[in-house]
UniProtKB/Swiss-Prot annotation:
The protein, known as: Nucleolar protein NET1
Species of the source: Saccharomyces cerevisiae (strain ATCC 204508 / S288c) (Baker's yeast)
GO cellular component: nucleolus; RENT complex
GO biological process assignments: cell division; negative regulation of exit from mitosis; nucleolus organization; positive regulation of protein localization to nucleolus; protein localization to nucleolus; rDNA heterochromatin formation
Keyword flag Nucleus: yes
Cross-referenced InterPro entries: Dnt1-like_N, Net1/Tof2
Phylogenetic placement of the source organism: Eukaryota, Fungi, Dikarya, Ascomycota, Saccharomycotina
Gene coding for it: NET1
Principal localisation: nucleus
Ranges of Basic and acidic residues composition bias in the record: 368-381, 526-543, 659-668, 692-702, 756-777, 806-815, 884-897, 905-919, 945-954, 1095-1109
Record PTM text: Phosphorylated by CDC5.
Cellular location(s): Nucleus, Nucleolus
Length: 1189
């Protein structure tokens, strides 16, 4: 079959050629509509395409409206074998059918092709219209077509539908038989039943259309019978033009009517669908559109806006036609909810065209409104109703409820344990307070917060606090106080962040050495506590495995957080640490635990321990140190008031835990930290600790002993810890997993810790403990002045009160000269360690010591002159601290002189041997010293240290005088023979063995840094001593400065550690022997430092006086007053302290420092060089004081 475009050309249009092309647009339309069919029908596709292109081009040129009234155009399907004569007959018949309004039958003069050629009637259609399907029919008569008249009976049917059965020629429409499917503009005339089918359709459609103008859109079903989509489009356009705009929107009354129609249709399908159809108003516009569009999806969308819940289901029901409607209503409703509507609509689309037509034709407009209401009820109740969907949502809500219940259940388990731990009285408080606090604490668990309003949920809330505990469990050690371990778990996250920071800093800057020394400083109190705190120690020992690695960072961080606690708490904490460390903890990790436990443990440590009584004396001691004696009852009371008032305010758990948790019941807060976010858990643990402290002053006293480091805070000792703990919490909230809980109170320890291997630190701490205990036993005053001066001085500048600061400074001044004096006599043996070899170490040390003494004698005048100059600069930089230190040093000179006298004999013996070697170096060193003195005034103290080696008491008898008898005897042992240098190097070798690797690295870095600093000094003799010494004071400074970030701490590291080192250097082994082994580990670093420091000091004193002068000028250029002062005044100190510290670094480094004991470890040297500049002010003041002395 060929599809031909028949164009009726009346005589008026025959003369004009453009009409051809004017037909072009219609042709183009038809060809465009069915280009494929045209090409397939015609053999010459190329030509047809070309013509089509021309036509399409012409289409734009010739307006279709110009030809509309003049000619008619329609499609005609004919057999390719028909002749043109037969074609003409078919055209006449088609015209009669298509245009019944024609007044006269058309008479065909000729048939032409698109190019206007007349065609022979004998031609076959396939021959002529293979390329072009346009047939121009030249008419004899004008075509009188009424524009209002419908083009075809199907057009009249439309009118009847639209006009409720009364055809009105309102809209011109181009209609071609559905068979042709070509759009034609036809003059509309009142529909006359030209065809029975037309009348029939109009009747049926009219009956249905009467229901609503929206229904006219249903006409597509009849048009759907017609194959052509264009007719449908025209119908839509026409309907929309005239009637559609109002009818589509009017939904209420027409919807009712149409709903009746639709309902009737659906009723046909099934009565059950009435539920789906229930709202015909919704259905009707959708149905009309759906029937037009034949697409279920748009229908669904239209349905939904009218009735959101019902429409989807209804639409589905409509789509799910008749038989399926019953189950499809429910299934479709569920499918809508499930998004299965697409599938339903697809089925509906497939079914729809046929089904909708029967529906329309059926014209079932019979759905009583009561049925609709019933359907609505059914929709509410039925499976298709939204209620069917709601159950799933309801299921979700129950899901949440069981989830809350589940959380409550596991919480209830925790709460049962917590309740068992908590007294019933505290439980109601904990419930109320936990409800308040758990808004934050229960962050991790929404259910606990929900439970919190419930009275029973409160134990659950406590369990919520447990949630963070799981993350913190690494620190939890089953100990006598489980809650204490749990609290530590809470605290370790706080500390973990601080520890991480401190560890990073300590790693970057070796700063952990002094803190363990601090820990060991107060061995006597710790020993007393050790007896009393045996239970606590046991618990702490259990906890220790997790804590030890955190010791250094904890100390450093705690020093930062609590400055005041550091000095006094450093002393007390060293005692506590000694007891706890002796108990099993290294470097006061237990003290950190104790300190943290002071707050947390007071709460957590429910088991009343004998240490409580000891904690009172310790707290009294701390308060006496702090001058806060009145605060001690407040401290116990203050644990409740402070922790509840200060830390509790910041910590939601504090108030709740204090109220809720009895000391007997630490578990609830332990539970709280487990489940609460770590910050909340930390707060809860801290607050609980505060609450238990409040509840149990004895425990607070116990913890106060462990927290003795916080006694400087005595009122706020724990409180400061809490404040620091709050900071720790805030800091550690991000890092809850770093186990140790010691961080909060360990701020006291933090300043001194240099970055060293834990082994080194432990050794130092052990040795320091041994040395310090011996020294304390021999002279508690001198020991406290030495170690306390270290710790308290370090803490003093930043934290401890002026009284403590002055005491610490006085102690420092005394201990520094004592250290220097003691270290100088011993220095003979070990100074060459820094230089190169252990074998030549003692010889060079003796030689250098002799030279140094000679040089010191000759250089003393220059040094004294430069000292005055450097003192002037020092006075500028540190007049305040320096004057106090000078006064205190002078005050301490007399006691130091007694010890110095003892040392003098030893030093004289050593100095005699060393003077020979020194005399050789004196000339060289004098030259170097002169250059160095010229370079920097700061280094006078180093010559004064050499003078100490010479005179051993000339200027710095103060430092010698203060040496405690234990240290003096140790110094005697060390200074008795240069062999002690080797023996000290041997004892240090023991310590060095662990830290030999670090020592070699430290030595190299120290020598490098010394080289950097020292420009003019010859490196061989000077390098061994001065390089080490100059870096070592700076190392001490850096190490101290890093943890405390306090110049005083650095000075303490330089001054007090050197004094301890020099004092203990003479006999580190003897001190270690004197001291219990427990004390030795903490003092091991000190003993190592001392053992190396004294021999190193002698060599270094002469060389370091020169080199440190050279170094000091270079470094003092950066820190002219502070660094030069710290270099010069600490040259004497650093001769001992830096030498001892370089030795301590080498001791820490161990075996390698046996090879070169005088060398400062690279870490200590780098830290010293790096830290010199940081604390320049504080160090300068202390150094100036020494210089002034």
């Amino acid at each position: 079959m060929y599809k031909l475009q028949v164009v009726l050309v009346p005589p008026s249009l025959q003369a004009t050629m453009p009409i051809q092309f004017g037909y072009g647009p219609t042709i183009a339309e038809s060809s465009q509509l069915l280009p494929n069919r045209t090409n397939m029908a015609q053999s010459a596709g190329d030509a047809s395409l070309q013509y089509a292109n021309l036509r399409s081009a012409n289409v734009s040129f010739t307006p279709s409206y110009f030809n509309q009234s003049r000619f008619r155009k329609f499609l005609l399907f004919t057999k390719p074998t028909n002749t043109l004569l037969n074609l003409s007959d078919e055209i006449i018949d088609k015209c009669e059918k298509m245009y019944p309004s024609l007044q006269e039958d058309i008479e065909i003069l000729s048939l032409q092709d698109n190019s206007g050629c007349d065609l022979d009637p004998d031609f076959l259609v396939k021959d002529v219209f293979n390329v072009n399907n346009i047939v121009r029919v030249i008419l004899k008569n004008e075509i009188d077509l009424d524009d209002s008249a419908p083009v075809s009976l199907y057009k009249s049917v439309k009118r009847s539908k639209l006009n409720n059965g009364s055809p009105q020629s309102v809209q011109p429409q181009q209609q071609i038989p559905s068979s042709s499917g070509v759009l034609r503009i036809a003059k509309k005339r009142p529909p006359t039943g030209t065809t029975t089918t037309t009348t029939i359709r109009s009747a049926t459609n009219g009956s249905m259309r009467v229901s609503t103008p929206l229904a006219r859109q249903i006409y597509p079903p009849p048009s759907s019978k017609i194959v052509s989509n264009n007719s449908d489009d025209e119908d839509e356009d026409i309907g929309e033009r005239s009637f559609l705009p109002p009818p589509t929107q009017p939904q209420s009354p027409p919807i009712r009517i149409s709903s009746g129609i639709d309902a009737g249709k659906k009723i046909k399908s099934s009565i059950v669908e009435e539920d789906i159809v229930s709202r015909s108003a919704t259905v009707d516009p959708d149905k009309t559109k759906q029937q037009r569009l034949l697409s279920g999806t748009p229908i669904m969308s239209t349905m939904t806006p009218n009735r959101v819940t019902l429409t989807g289901q209804r639409v589905v029901s409509e789509h799910a036609h008749k038989n399926e409607l019953v189950f499809s209503a429910s299934a479709s409703s569920s499918s809508f909810a499930n998004g299965g509507t697409a599938a339903v609509t697809a089925q509906d689309i497939n079914r729809k065209p046929p089904v909708t037509t029967p529906r329309i034709t059926s014209g079932m407009l019979k759905i009583p409104e009561p049925r609709i209401s019933e359907i609505e009820k059914e929709l509410k109740e039925g499976p298709s109703s939204p209620a069917s969907i709601l159950p799933a949502k309801a299921a979700k809500i129950p899901m949440k409820k069981p989830y809350l219940e589940n959380g409550e259940n596991y919480e209830s388990d925790d709460s049962s344990s917590s309740e068992n731990q908590e007294t019933p009285e505290t439980e109601p408080h904990s419930k109320a307070s936990l409800q308040r606090s758990q808004s934050s604490i229960a962050d991790n668990n929404g259910s606990p917060v929900k439970n919190s309003p419930l009275g029973d949920a409160m134990p659950h809330n406590v369990h919520l606090a447990e949630l963070p505990k799981a993350s913190n469990t690494s620190i939890t050690k089953s100990s006598n106080g489980e809650s204490w371990g749990k609290q530590q778990e809470h605290q370790p996250p706080r500390k973990s962040s601080l520890e991480t920071i401190v560890e990073k800093k300590s790693q970057a800057e070796p700063s952990g050495i002094v803190e363990p020394k601090r820990m060991t400083n107060f061995l006597d109190d710790n020993q007393v506590r050790e007896k009393e705190d045996t239970n606590d120690k046991l618990l702490e020992k259990e906890i220790l495995p997790t804590i030890p690695h955190n010791d250094q960072p904890i100390l450093a961080s705690s020093d930062k957080s609590n400055g005041t606690l550091k000095s006094l708490a450093g002393k007390v904490s060293s005692n506590n640490n000694a007891s706890k460390e002796d108990g099993t903890i290294i470097n006061g990790t237990i003290e950190d635990d104790g300190n943290d436990n002071d707050e947390v443990d007071t709460t957590v440590r429910i088991v009343p321990q004998d240490s409580d009584s000891s904690s009172f004396p310790k707290s009294d001691l701390f308060k006496m140190i702090e001058g806060d004696d009145t605060d001690l009852p407040q401290w116990f009371k203050g644990k409740n008031s402070r922790t509840s008032g200060n830390s509790k305010n910041s910590k939601p758990y504090t108030t709740v835990l204090n109220k809720d948790i009895d000391n007997s019941k630490p578990d609830p807060r332990n539970i709280l930290p487990q489940r609460t976010p770590r910050s909340a858990a930390k707060r809860a643990a801290q607050l609980l600790a505060g609450a238990k402290k409040n509840e149990v002053p004895q425990k607070s006293t116990e913890d106060s002993s462990s927290a003795a480091s916080t006694d400087d805070e005595s009122e706020s000792g724990i409180e400061t810890d809490f404040s620091s703990d709050d900071d720790f919490k805030r800091k550690n909230m991000s890092v809850p997993n770093n186990g140790p809980k010691d961080i909060s109170l360990h701020s006291l320890k933090g300043s001194v810790v240099p970055v060293k291997d834990s082994k080194i630190i432990n050794k130092e701490v052990d040795e320091e403990r041994n040395d310090k205990r011996d020294s304390q036993k021999k002279s508690a005053v001198s020991e406290s002045s030495v170690t306390n001066s270290k710790i308290s001085e370090q803490m003093a500048k930043s934290f401890y009160p002026n009284s403590n600061k002055k005491q610490n400074e006085a102690t420092k001044v005394e201990t520094k000269p004592a250290t220097q004096a003691s270290s100088f006599p011993v220095v003979g043996g070990s100074p060459s360690v820094a230089t190169k070899g252990t074998t030549s170490f003692n010889e060079e040390g003796n030689r250098k010591n002799v030279k140094t003494k000679a040089k010191n004698e000759s250089a003393q005048i220059d040094r004294q002159q430069k000292e005055t100059t450097s003192r002037v600069a020092d006075l500028k930089s540190a007049n305040i601290g320096g004057e106090d230190l000078n006064k205190k040093a002078e005050g301490s000179k007399e006691p130091e002189k007694a010890s110095a006298n003892i040392q003098d004999a030893n030093d004289k013996n050593n100095s005699k041997e060393k003077e020979d070697s020194k005399s050789k170096q004196v000339s060289q060193k004098k030259l170097k010293m002169t250059d160095h003195l010229k370079e920097g005034n700061v280094q006078l103290p180093k010559p004064s240290a050499n003078d100490k080696l010479k005179d051993l008491k000339a200027k710095f008898t103060n430092s010698k005088t203060l040496v405690p008898p234990g240290i003096i005897s140790n110094e005697k042992n060390n200074s008795s023979a240069n062999d002690d240098d080797s023996s000290s190097s041997g004892s240090s070798t023991e310590d060095e063995s662990s830290s030999s690797s670090s020592s070699s690295d430290e030595e190299t870095s120290t020598s490098r840094k010394a080289r950097r600093v020292v420009v003019n000094t010859p490196r061989e003799p000077v390098r061994s001593s001065s390089k080490i010494e100059a870096p070592s004071p700076s190392v001490n400074k850096k190490i101290n400065a890093t943890p405390d970030k306090i110049p005083v701490t650095q000075l303490m590291d330089m001054s007090s550690p050197p004094s301890v080192k020099s004092k203990t250097t003479s006999n580190p082994s003897s001190i270690l022997h004197d001291l219990p082994r427990k004390v030795r580990p903490s003092l091991s670093s000190l003993s190592d430092l001392v053992s190396r420091g004294i021999p190193d000091v002698k060599e270094k004193t002469s060389k370091s006086n020169e080199k440190s002068q050279t170094k000091a000028p270079s470094s003092s250029d950066d820190e002219s007053s502070s660094d030069s002062d710290s270099n010069s005044s600490s040259d004497s100190v650093s001769d001992s302290s830096s030498d001892s510290k370089s030795e301590s670094d080498s001791d820490d480094s161990g075996d390698s420092s046996d090879d070169g004991k005088s060398f400062i470890s690279a870490k200590s040297a780098s830290a010293a060089l790096g830290k010199k500049k940081k604390p320049s002010g504080g160090f300068a003041s202390l150094i100036k004081d020494f210089k002034k002395k």
